[in-house]
């Protein structure tokens, strides 16, 4: 069985790790980096992922996608999505089923389809390191992801050609990375995870006893639309407003200018974590009738902190809720772990320190801990890591809509998973032959205020008075936190397994089609790579042949020169096209046309070899006249 890899599919950056010699190892991508920007760009003839996609974003803003994780498993009409519609340079659209999709060059794409490109790069990175095909993975998600978002993440894995063996919560993965080497004792750890697009807090008990380790999540909370991207946007808006005050021009109407502004704002934010002031300097940011305009604005750390103060405060309320749900106080927390790049901001660290009354640990890499934890969980599943038990929870309550549009909960939030729950329901009217079961996720009493996961009808109920039929509804949450529902008519004993047909999400057919498309693109990518290789070989041969023709000079007959030149011209013409066979044929013709040239080069080489042999004889003769002498080493005491 091949290795199961661990992938942190992040909003801003992604990371892949694998167990190597019993230890989790973070892998470097093709660019030599341990993290990969979660950016995907579509051009006329290829899909670009990671740093290369980020570099070309300024010239291709409408077809370069970032922070796609904020759209995964979401409805277009969601408030969070509508906020992004107004600020993203790319097009966010409503799919036929109401989901939030994106559009590039007229192609409509689901977020899992776009995210799959990042997962494919992570898969390739692992395959290059391991030297074998990778087909299985553990993928992390924010702890506060709902059922739709978790299912969409699994779909992304499938489209990328991965069998997702487990979906694991990011804070839990970070706790695994932190606690795996802690051999003794019982620790209660708070994992504060503020990433690029999401925020989570998990309270986790780590019990290490005689080599056995249990990681039990006591409570989790968070906000799936709060992260570093929001911090960036505050700074972007400030810079755009300041420029408008100075120049009277609104940069928000210029996608190219906004892309440059985004890069500069992100860079300035990072710099202000280690310095008290910086300058954003963007020459030729835009132009009007009076000429080009330049943006030069100084920013202090204090200014940035004032712009994002409310965002930092927003992270504190979930901390209070998680502690209350775990029935703990801040004094019960032994260690605080910071995860996610945004936690490098000093003001964030200060807020966390003040809340818990203790300094967070500095020995956990906030960018890599989640991927390391995913690799450890992969090791647990494959049997390579033993004596580790992970007990995670469902972040939100699950239930169904009952009379009066009330949500009746079957499984409470922070219940350890996997778990099952059942409850008996009945009909609301006499002789009712079918019931509609509306499955919900959330904490509100009013059904419509919660997340709808879908609904199904149970038909064939025997006619009876209202309240007499007994229908047992079973909720089953698997280890990935994904819900399965079944229903049983207790009178007949007939059980029916129900697959929720959610109003949102990708159907089985859509996922299968996307998998086929991805496989087709894989073939295209391979052919493109082979074409480029043929072009490079042909180009190299032309360059070498030209050099040899010059070196041969008059020794090469003019007839052969003409023949070689014609063959080189044919190669140059073939290289400009996309026909690999034509390039290889032209290359072979050039090799054959250069036969005389090869003979001249070989003869010249042999002649030089003869000269070298004569020179060698002279050198040996001179060596016979050399007299060996004793010598004494003189040491310089002044050194």
Swiss-Prot record:
InterPro entries in UniProt: ATPase_NBD (IPR043129), Chaperone_DnaK (IPR012725), Heat_shock_70_CS (IPR018181), HSP70_C_sf (IPR029048), HSP70_peptide-bd_sf (IPR029047), Hsp_70_fam (IPR013126)
Gene3D superfamilies assigned to the protein according to its UniProt record, in alphabetical order: 1.20.1270.10, 3.30.420.40, Actin, Chain A, domain 4, Substrate Binding Domain Of DNAk, Chain A, domain 1
Residue numbers spanned by region Disordered: 604-639
Family matches, as SUPFAM superfamilies: Actin-like ATPase domain, Heat shock protein 70kD (HSP70), peptide-binding domain
Feature: compositional bias, Low complexity: 606-624
GO molecular function, one term: unfolded protein binding
PTM annotation (Phosphothreonine): residues: 198
Stated role: Acts as a chaperone.
Family: Belongs to the heat shock protein 70 family.
Protein name: Chaperone protein DnaK
Species this chain originates from: Shewanella baltica (strain OS223)
Lineage: Bacteria, Pseudomonadati, Pseudomonadota, Gammaproteobacteria, Alteromonadales
């Amino acid at each position: 069985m091949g290795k199961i890899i661990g992938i942190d599919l992040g909003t801003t950056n992604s990371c892949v790790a694998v167990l190597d010699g019993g230890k989790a190892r973070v892998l470097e991508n093709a660019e030599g980096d341990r993290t990969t920007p979660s950016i995907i760009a579509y051009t006329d003839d290829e899909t670009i992922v990671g740093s290369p996609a980020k570099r070309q974003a300024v010239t291709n803003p409408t077809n370069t996608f970032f922070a796609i994780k904020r759209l995964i498993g979401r409805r277009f009409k969601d408030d969070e999505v509508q906020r992004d519609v107004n600020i993203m340079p790319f097009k966010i659209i409503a799919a036929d089923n109401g989901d939030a999709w994106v559009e590039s060059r007229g192609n409509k794409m689901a977020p899992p389809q776009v995210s799959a490109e990042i997962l494919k790069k992570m898969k390739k990175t692992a395959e290059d390191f391991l030297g074998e095909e990778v087909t299985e993975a553990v993928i992390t998600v924010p702890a506060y992801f709902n059922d739709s978002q978790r299912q969409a993440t699994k779909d992304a894995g499938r489209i990328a050609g991965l069998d997702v063996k487990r979906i694991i919560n990011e804070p839990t993965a970070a706790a695994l990375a932190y606690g795996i080497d802690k051999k003794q004792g019982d620790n209660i750890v708070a994992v504060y995870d503020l990433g690029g697009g999401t925020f989570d807090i998990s309270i986790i008990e780590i019990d290490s006893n005689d080599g056995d380790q249990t990681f039990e999540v006591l409570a989790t909370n968070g906000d799936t639309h709060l992260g570093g991207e929001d911090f960036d946007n505050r700074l972007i808006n400030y810079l755009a407003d300041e420029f408008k005050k100075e120049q009277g021009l609104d940069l928000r109407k210029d996608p190219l200018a906004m892309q440059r502004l985004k890069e500069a704002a992100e860079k300035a934010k990072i710099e202000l974590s280690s310095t008290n002031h910086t300058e954003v300097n963007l020459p030729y940011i835009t132009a009007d009738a009076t000429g080009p305009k330049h943006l030069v604005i100084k920013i202090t750390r204090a200014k940035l902190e004032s712009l994002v103060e409310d965002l930092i405060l927003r992270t504190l309320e979930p901390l209070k809720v998680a502690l209350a749900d775990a029935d703990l106080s801040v004094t019960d927390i032994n260690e605080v772990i910071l995860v996610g790049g945004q936690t490098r901001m000093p003001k964030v660290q200060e807020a966390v320190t003040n809340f818990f009354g203790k300094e967070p640990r500095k020995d956990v890499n906030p960018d890599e801990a989640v991927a390391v934890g995913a690799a450890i969980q992969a090791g647990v599943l494959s049997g390579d890591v033993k004596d580790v038990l992970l007990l995670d929870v469902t972040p939100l309550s699950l239930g169904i809509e009952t009379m009066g549009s009330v949500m009746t909960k079957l499984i409470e939030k922070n219940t350890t998973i996997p778990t099952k729950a059942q409850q008996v329901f009945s009909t609301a009217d006499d002789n009712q032959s079918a019931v509609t079961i509306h499955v919900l996720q959330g904490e509100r009493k009013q059904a419509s205020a919660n997340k709808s996961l879908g609904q199904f009808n149970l038909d064939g109920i025997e006619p009876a008075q209202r309240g007499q039929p007994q229908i047992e509804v079973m909720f089953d949450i698997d280890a990935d936190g994904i819900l399965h529902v079944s229903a049983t008519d207790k009178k007949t004993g007939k059980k029916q397994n129900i697959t929720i047909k959610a109003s949102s999400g990708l159907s089985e057919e859509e996922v299968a089609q996307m998998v086929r498309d991805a496989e087709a693109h894989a073939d295209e990518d391979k052919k493109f790579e082979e074409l480029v290789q043929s072009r490079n070989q042909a180009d190299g041969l032309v360059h070498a042949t030209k050099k040899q023709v010059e070196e041969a000079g008059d020794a090469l007959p003019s007839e052969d020169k003409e023949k070689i030149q014609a063959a080189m011209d044919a190669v140059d013409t073939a290289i400009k096209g996309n026909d690999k066979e034509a390039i290889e044929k032209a290359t072979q013709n050039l090799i054959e046309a250069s036969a005389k040239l090869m003979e001249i080069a070989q003869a010249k080489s042999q002649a030089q070899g003869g000269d070298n042999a004569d020179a060698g004889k002279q050198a040996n003769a001179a060596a016979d006249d050399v007299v060996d002498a004793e010598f004494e080493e003189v040491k310089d005491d002044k050194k």
